């Protein structure tokens, strides 16, 4: 599930209130590191944070893991496997939330490279679940030096994890004053960790919101700042109740700041081939989207209509592949 909404700009950024919120933070852990430059889409580094002990580890990813699991969902599932046992439940401290963007993450000339995969053991099924989400967090994490992040353990109180890929810093901070609702929290943290108004586009926030305190089927919200509309927008990793696991670990938010995205920051193997295929892909999307998917106009919800038209929309427990009531469901 991927959906999107816009939220109003944070009250012309009441920066005095933001300053008070930040001053109320208690830094539980601070780590300086040297961000590794990408080579052919990889840094071969993973970031592992244990909230029970406030430990932060930067670990190597072996070549054989890269060859077999590639990145994205592969890395997420591999390191979820390493962190858990057959007896691990969704609310066990060792249950990990893993996030990874693939080797082409953030390539500006190829559509869809903002995607990030998220995995955990689901509170709905007690088995692994994955969900994908757009926005900027995946590329920012990659450009900050990490192919995958693992969040394990449980904090004693609500914390915010902050990664700054330009400064080379990682911190775990107790954050008592910020709002819990994602549409407000995203605005607050974007204003808090941006260097100025022009820097807001370089901040991505992951949060679960207040619903995750009450409901297993809760999502993770990923923010990004839209300069054209001058608003913070939200996308969701909506499957499997990952937000519930996030909140159960007492993570109020995960913030990543990175400034300096450019066309070939991950140094792909053959940029000329990528440019050629990217141009072809962009042309197809621009020409065919309005006729086939209407994603630009209507978003993910329109896919229900497409699935029903092709008789592959699960209906009445998969008894049918479509419905004549699709006008009530899809735009």
Q: Where do the protein language model's features map onto the residues?
A:
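Intrinsically disordered, low-complexity segments enriched in small residues
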Residues: 2-132, 136-331
């Amino acid at each position: 599930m991927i959906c999107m909404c816009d939220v109003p700009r944070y009250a012309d950024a009441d920066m005095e209130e933001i300053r008070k919120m930040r001053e109320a933070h208690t830094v539980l852990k601070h780590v300086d590191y040297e961000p590794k430059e990408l080579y052919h889409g990889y840094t071969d580094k993973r970031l592992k944070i244990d909230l029970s002990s406030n430990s932060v580890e930067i670990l190597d990813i072996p070549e054989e893991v890269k060859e077999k699991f590639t990145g994205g969902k592969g890395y997420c599932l591999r390191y979820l496997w390493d962190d858990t046992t057959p007896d691990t439940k969704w609310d066990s401290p060792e249950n990990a939330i893993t996030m990874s963007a693939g080797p082409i993450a953030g390539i500006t000339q190829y559509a869809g490279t903002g995607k990030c995969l998220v995995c955990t053991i689901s509170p709905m099924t007690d088995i692994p679940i994955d969900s994908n989400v757009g926005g900027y967090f995946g590329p920012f994490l990659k450009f900050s030096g990490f192919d995958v992040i693992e969040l394990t353990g449980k904090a004693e109180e609500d914390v915010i994890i902050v990664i700054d890929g330009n400064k080379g810093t990682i911190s775990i901070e107790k954050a008592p004053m910020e709002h819990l609702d994602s549409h407000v929290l995203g605005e607050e943290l974007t204003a808090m960790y941006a260097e100025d108004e022009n820097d807001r586009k370089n901040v991505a926030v992951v949060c679960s919101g207040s619903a995750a305190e009450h409901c297993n089927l809760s999502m993770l919200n990923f923010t990004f700042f839209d300069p054209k509309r001058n608003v913070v927008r939200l996308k969701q990793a909506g499957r499997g109740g990952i937000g519930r696991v996030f909140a159960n670990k007492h993570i109020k938010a995960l913030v990543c700041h990175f400034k300096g995205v450019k066309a070939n920051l991950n140094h792909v193997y053959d940029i000329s081939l990528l440019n050629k295929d990217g141009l072809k892909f962009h042309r197809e999307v621009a020409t065919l989207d309005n006729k086939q998917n209407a994603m630009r106009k209507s978003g993910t919800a329109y896919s229900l209509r497409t699935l029903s038209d092709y008789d592959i929309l699960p209906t009445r427990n998969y008894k049918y592949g479509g419905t004549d009531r699709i006008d009530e469901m899809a735009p």
